[in-house]
């Protein structure tokens, strides 16, 4: 009797692991609303931003009105350096196509991306594409 229960549990594990990864189709299914260019231009200047990387790191910065910021990260992607913090110079802008675009110059690498921003309830998510329903949704926090 225990063996069938254990087998069912083990088969379900991959589904549970994937459940935390939201994609654009999930955002749309939850009635997520894409922010317009005008809404982004209202929200982004002076916004305090928290961005969560795919590796689990959280990065913090404040969008200065001049399009610049200094970011810090808790560098969770490197298990050999617990407690390590990295800083980066960055720039931000709102694209004409309705994307929030960021460039970061970390000590060992550069990062540049644009995301379409959706709001679901009180949470924000960014996606690379608004046509690919399987595009991974990255969580953001924006506050003033």
Where do the PLM segments sit?
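Bacterial N-terminal signal peptides
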Residues: 7-14
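Lipid interaction determinants
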Residues: 17-91, 97-144
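Positively charged n-region of N-terminal signal peptides that target proteins for export
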Residues: 1-4
